[in-house]
C-alpha cells in the first residue's frame, strides 16, 4: 500500500476497472427490488459546470447507497441534444450543428467519467439521433389521430432575437427565458398539444406526490391556475352582441362596475375597426399581454371601448374596458370587475378613475363608519338590494338561481394553463411529421416514411432554417402521388426531454416507442434530481407526457416520479472593477489577491493591474459574472473524490452551496487522514476474529458503540432524510475518535478493522475511487462495488449507558444511568418516572427543563 494518498494514480485505474467489467450495467431482474435514480438530462453545451457536478453527485451517492442495500439500481445518462445554442454555434463557426453537438458530447462524457459516476453507459441516448426522435414523431401522429394536437392561427410569444415562438412557461417577466430579451406577441399558424385537457388531473394528482417539495407543487398549482366559478352572459347595449365574462366570486356581482376584456378578445377587435385610438392601444398592448408572473408588477393600462353591457340583475349599464391585466387566453378573455373587493380591479379603477362600489362589510371595521373600506374577504352582503345580509354561501346560491332562470349562467372551471405550443421556427430540432396538401388539408406523414430527417446544410447564414423553407426541395414532396408541402417548423425541445426517462428503460427497443416489459419493471422513477427552475416548464411537461403515454397504454401508473430533489445553486465569490465607460468588468476570483495599501489597510486587488476590486458577494456561478470554477481544475488539483465529498458536505442539498477552496482543502486533508489511518493499521487485515461485545472493556465498548451509533445515523441521514452533510459530519467524528484509539490487544485490533471497514463502506457512495482502493488493501483485492451496507446491532446500543447528573435549579440531586440510544423525549420520560426524582419534584412547579446531552438534566422550578 502506498504511504501517501494520490488520486491521480487511483482514479483512472478504478474507472478503467468499472468500464472493463461493466460493473454498472443492469438488466430487469424480478428477483431483486429495483431502484431507478435519475438526474435531469444535460444539454451538451461544451463543458460541465459546478451545478452539473452537484446534481450528478447527489444522484450518484443515492444510486451507490441503494445498490449497497441490495437493490437493482438503474442510473442512466444521455444528452438533450437539440436546441438553439448548437444552431448559433453552427452559424458562427460555419459547421454543422450535429458536428458541434457530437464534439461537445464526447468532451462532456469524458468529464462525467472522470468524476466516477456509476452510469449504465449502455443506455446512453442522444435526442438528436433519428433512432430516438423517430418515436417522438410517431407518437405525435397518434396524438393527431386522437385529435389531441391541432394547428391554428394563434397569438404566440415571439422572441425577436432568437426568431422563434416561446411557450407561456418560457416567458419570464415578459422576457425570453433563454436570451432575456423582451418578447412580442404575434399571430401565426402554430401546432399545439391539448395539455388543457389534462389540467384537472395535473392539478389533482399533485396531492399524490407526497415526496415532492411543497414549493414545487405550489408553483405548479399556481401555474395551472385552477379557478372554479361562473360564466355569465352579458348583453351589449344597443347591439345583438353578447360578452361571456367569468367570475369566481358570484356573491360580488352587485358590486360589478365594469367588464374587463383583453386586447385579444374578439370584441376588442370588433370595436377597434371603427376607432383608431383603440386599434393603436391594442397593437401596443397585444405585445405585452400579461403573463402570470407579470400581474403583480403590471402598470394596469387600459382604454374605454365606449361600449356598455347590461347588468343582468340591476339592468343598469356598465362600461366595457380593454385592459392589459387579463392573462392572454384565460377563460373567455373577459372578467367581471368588482374593484371594491379585488386588488387588480381596484388598482385599475384607481388609475382610470372608475366607479368603486362596496358590497361586503369589512370585518376589521365592523359597526363603525369605516365598514365600507376595501376587503377581499368573504362576508355579509350590503348595498346589494335583495341579497343584503346574506353570507357568501347563501348569496352565491340565491344569485345563481336568479341567473339560471334567465338562462345566462353556467358553472365553469377555468385554468390559466394554456395548450402547449410546440412549434419552433428553428432548424436544429425534430421535424414535425405533418404536411399540407394544395387544397389546405393537413395530413400526417405516413408512418412507413418515418423518421422525417432534417435536410443537409450547404450554406450558412444568419438562419439555418432556409433549407426547410416552404419553397425548398426538402419541403415539396409527394405523398400517395399528391403534391404536399412538409411542415417546416420543428418541435419545442421540451418534447424530447418529456419522455426520455421512459426510453432509458429500453434504449435499444426497435419495434416500438417503449418496451412494455422493461417500463413496467423500472417505472416509476424512484428518485429524480434537478433544479427548482424547472418546476413550471420541464416538470409540468414531464408529468403531462407521462399521462399521454399512459392513455396510449405505453406506460402504467399516473405519475412518472415518486421522489423529487431540487438541489440548490452553487455560489462563488464575485469581484468587479469599473472600466473607463463606467461599466462593470468582472474579475475571476483566481485573479484576485489580498495586499496592503500604502495606509497599511488590507485590500483585494486584481493581480494583473494591481487595482482595487469591489466585492459583489456570493453570487451564482455564471459566465456573465466570470466567477465559475472549472471542475477539471479541482479534479486535477485534489481528485474527483475530494470534489464529490466537498459538494455533498458543504451545504444541505436544497440550500445554496458557497464555493470556498479552503473547504475543498479541508476535505482533501480528511481523506489523507483516513488513508494514513489505514496505512498505519494495515496489519489488521490479517485479523479474522469478530468483535465479541460481551468481553469488551469500557474503552472498547465506548468505541464500538460509537461505531454502531454512527452506522444508524449515517444510514438514516442518507436513506430517509437525504441529509448528506450531516452523514459526512458523523463519519468525521467517528474517524477522529478512531484516530486516538490505542491498540493494546487483539480485541482492539478487531475493533479497528471493523471500524475502518465500516467507514470505508459508509464513505463509498461519496468517494468511490478512494474507497475502492482502500477496500482492496484491507480485503485482499476484493471489490467493494458488490459489498453491502454496514449493519448495526441493537443489543449493542441497548447496553450502552451513560450517567446523567440530575439537578434542580442548578444543584445536584443525584446521578442516573440512561441508555445512550434514547432521544431527548425518551430520556425525560424515563427520568420523570424514577421514584427518586418524583419525590424531589413533588409539589414543585416545573418552569422548564434544561437538557445537555449525555451530561445534565436541570429542572428549573
Swiss-Prot record:
Binding site for ATP: 623
UniProt subcellular location: Cytoplasm
GO process annotations (BP): leucyl-tRNA aminoacylation
Main localization of the protein described in the UniProt heading: cytoplasm
Motif ('KMSKS' region) on chain: 620-624
EC number(s) given by UniProt: 6.1.1.4
Pfam families according to UniProt: Anticodon_1 (PF08264), tRNA-synt_1 (PF00133), tRNA-synt_1_2 (PF13603), tRNA-synt_1g (PF09334)
InterPro entries: aa-tRNA-synth_I_CS, aa-tRNA-synth_Ia, Leu-tRNA-ligase, Leu_tRNA-synth_edit, M/V/L/I-tRNA-synth_anticd-bd, Methionyl/Leucyl_tRNA_Synth, Rossmann-like_a/b/a_fold, tRNAsynth_Ia_anticodon-bd
Reaction(s) the record says it catalyses: tRNA(Leu) + L-leucine + ATP = L-leucyl-tRNA(Leu) + AMP + diphosphate
Motif 'HIGH' region per UniProt: ranges: 42-52
Keywords: Aminoacyl-tRNA synthetase, ATP-binding, Cytoplasm, Ligase, Nucleotide-binding, Protein biosynthesis
GO cellular component, one term: cytosol
Gene3D superfamilies in the record: 2.20.28.290, 3.10.20.590, HUPs, Isoleucyl-tRNA Synthetase, Domain 1
Molecular-function annotations in GO: aminoacyl-tRNA deacylase activity; ATP binding; leucine-tRNA ligase activity
Homology family: Belongs to the class-I aminoacyl-tRNA synthetase family.
Protein name: Leucine--tRNA ligase
Organism classification: Bacteria, Pseudomonadati, Pseudomonadota, Gammaproteobacteria, Enterobacterales
Amino acid at each position: 500500500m502506498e504511504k501517501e494518498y494520490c488520486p491521480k494514480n487511483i482514479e483512472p485505474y478504478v474507472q478503467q476497472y468499472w468500464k472493463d467489467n461493466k460493473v454498472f450495467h443492469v438488466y430487469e431482474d424480478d428477483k431483486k427490488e429495483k431502484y431507478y435514480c435519475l438526474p435531469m438530462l444535460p444539454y451538451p453545451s461544451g463543458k460541465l459546470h459546478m451545478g452539473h457536478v452537484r446534481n450528478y453527485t447527489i444522484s450518484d451517492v443515492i444510486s451507490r447507497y441503494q445498490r449497497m442495500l441490495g437493490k437493482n439500481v438503474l442510473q442512466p445518462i444521455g444528452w438533450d441534444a437539440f436546441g438553439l445554442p448548437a444552431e448559433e454555434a453552427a452559424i458562427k463557426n460555419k459547421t454543422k450543428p450535429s458536428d458541434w453537438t457530437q464534439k461537445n458530447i464526447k468532451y462532456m462524457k469524458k468529464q462525467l467519467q472522470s468524476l466516477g459516476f456509476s452510469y449504465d453507459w449502455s443506455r446512453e441516448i442522444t435526442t438528436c439521433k433519428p433512432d430516438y426522435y423517430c418515436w417522438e414523431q410517431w407518437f405525435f401522429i397518434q396524438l393527431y389521430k386522437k385529435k389531441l394536437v391541432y394547428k391554428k392561427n394563434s397569438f404566440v410569444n415571439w422572441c425577436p432575437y432568437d426568431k422563434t415562438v416561446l411557450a407561456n412557461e418560457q416567458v419570464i417577466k415578459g422576457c425570453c427565458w433563454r436570451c432575456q430579451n423582451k418578447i412580442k406577441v404575434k399571430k401565426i399558424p402554430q401546432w399545439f398539444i391539448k395539455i388543457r385537457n389534462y389540467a384537472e388531473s395535473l392539478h389533482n394528482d399533485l396531492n399524490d406526490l407526497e415526496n415532492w417539495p411543497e414549493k414545487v407543487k405550489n408553483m405548479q398549482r399556481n401555474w395551472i391556475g385552477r379557478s372554479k366559478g361562473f360564466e355569465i352572459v352579458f348583453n351589449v347595449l344597443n347591439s345583438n352582441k353578447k360578452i361571456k365574462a367569468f367570475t369566481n366570486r358570484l356573491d360580488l356581482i352587485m358590486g360589478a362596475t365594469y367588464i374587463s376584456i383583453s386586447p385579444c378578445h374578439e370584441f376588442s377587435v370588433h370595436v377597434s375597426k371603427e376607432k383608431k385610438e383603440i386599434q393603436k392601444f391594442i397593437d401596443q398592448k397585444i405585445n405585452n399581454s400579461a403573463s402570470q408572473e407579470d400581474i403583480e408588477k403590471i402598470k394596469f393600462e387600459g382604454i374605454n371601448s365606449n361600449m356598455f353591457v347590461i347588468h343582468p340583475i340591476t339592468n343598469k349599464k356598465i362600461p366595457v374596458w380593454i385592459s392589459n391585466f387579463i392573462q392572454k387566453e384565460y377563460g373567455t378573455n373577459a372578467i367581471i370587475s368588482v374593484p371594491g373587493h379585488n386588488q387588480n380591479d381596484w388598482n385599475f379603477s384607481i388609475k382610470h378613475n372608475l366607479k368603486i362600489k362596496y358590497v361586503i362589510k369589512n370585518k376589521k371595521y365592523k359597526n363603525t363608519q369605516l365598514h365600507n373600506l376595501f376587503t377581499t374577504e368573504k362576508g355579509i352582503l350590503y348595498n346589494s338590494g335583495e341579497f343584503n345580509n346574506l353570507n357568501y354561501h347563501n348569496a352565491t346560491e340565491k344569485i345563481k338561481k336568479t341567473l339560471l332562470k334567465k338562462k345566462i349562467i353556467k358553472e365553469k372551471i377555468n385554468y390559466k394553463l394554456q395548450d402547449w405550443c410546440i412549434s419552433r421556427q428553428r432548424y436544429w430540432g425534430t421535424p414535425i411529421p405533418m404536411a399540407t396538401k394544395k387544397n389546405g388539408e393537413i395530413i400526417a406523414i405516413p408512418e412507413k416514411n418515418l423518421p422525417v430527417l432534417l435536410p443537409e446544410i450547404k450554406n450558412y447564414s444568419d438562419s439555418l432554417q432556409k433549407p426547410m423553407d416552404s419553397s425548398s426541395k426538402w419541403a415539396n414532396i409527394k405523398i400517395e402521388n399528391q403534391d404536399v408541402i412538409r411542415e417546416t417548423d420543428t418541435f419545442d425541445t421540451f418534447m424530447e426531454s418529456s419522455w426520455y426517462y421512459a426510453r432509458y428503460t429500453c434504449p435499444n427497443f426497435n419495434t416500438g416507442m417503449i418496451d412494455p416489459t422493461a417500463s413496467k419493471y423500472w417505472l416509476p422513477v424512484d428518485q429524480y434530481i434537478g433544479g427548482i427552475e424547472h418546476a413550471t416548464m420541464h416538470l409540468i411537461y414531464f408529468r403531462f407526457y407521462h399521462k399521454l403515454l399512459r392513455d396510449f397504454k405505453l406506460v402504467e401508473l399516473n405519475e412518472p416520479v415518486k421522489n423529487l430533489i431540487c438541489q440548490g445553486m452553487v455560489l462563488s465569490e464575485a469581484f468587479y472593477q469599473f472600466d473607463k465607460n463606467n461599466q462593470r468588468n468582472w474579475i475571476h476570483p483566481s485573479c484576485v489577491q489580498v495586499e496592503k495599501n500604502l495606509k497599511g489597510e488590507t485590500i483585494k486587488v486584481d493581480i494583473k493591474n494591481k487595482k482595487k476590486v469591489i466585492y459583489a458577494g456570493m453570487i451564482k456561478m455564471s459566465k456573465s459574472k466570470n466567477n465559475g470554477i472549472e471542475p477539471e481544475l479541482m479534479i486535477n488539483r485534489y481528485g474527483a473524490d475530494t470534489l464529490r465529498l466537498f459538494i455533498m458536505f458543504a451545504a444541505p442539498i436544497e440550500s445554496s452551496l458557497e464555493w470556498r477552496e479552503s473547504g475543498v482543502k479541508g476535505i482533501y486533508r480528511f481523506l489523507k487522514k483516513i488513508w494514513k489511518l489505514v496505512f498505519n493499521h494495515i496489519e489488521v487485515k490479517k485479523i479474522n476474529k469478530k468483535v465479541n461485545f460481551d468481553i469488551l472493556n469500557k474503552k472498547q465498548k465506548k468505541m464500538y458503540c460509537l461505531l454502531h451509533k454512527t452506522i444508524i445515523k449515517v444510514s438514516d441521514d442518507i436513506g430517509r432524510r437525504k441529509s448528506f452533510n450531516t452523514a459526512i459530519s458523523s463519519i468525521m467524528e467517528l474517524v477522529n475518535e478512531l484516530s486516538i484509539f490505542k491498540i493494546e490487544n487483539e480485541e482492539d485490533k478487531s475493533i479497528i478493522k471493523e471500524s475502518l471497514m465500516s467507514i470505508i463502506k459508509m464513505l463509498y457512495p461519496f468517494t468511490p475511487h478512494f474507497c475502492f482502493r482502500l477496500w482492496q488493501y484491507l480485503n485482499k483485492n476484493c471489490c467493494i462495488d458488490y459489498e453491502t451496507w454496514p449493519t448495526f446491532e441493537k443489543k449493542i446500543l441497548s447496553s450502552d449507558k451513560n450517567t446523567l447528573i440530575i439537578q434542580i435549579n442548578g444543584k445536584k440531586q443525584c446521578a442516573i444511568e440512561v441508555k445512550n440510544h434514547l432521544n431527548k423525549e425518551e430520556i425525560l420520560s424515563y427520568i420523570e418516572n424514577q421514584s427518586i426524582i418524583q419525590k424531589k419534584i413533588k409539589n414543585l412547579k416545573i418552569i422548564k427543563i434544561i437538557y445537555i446531552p449525555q451530561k445534565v438534566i436541570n429542572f428549573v422550578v
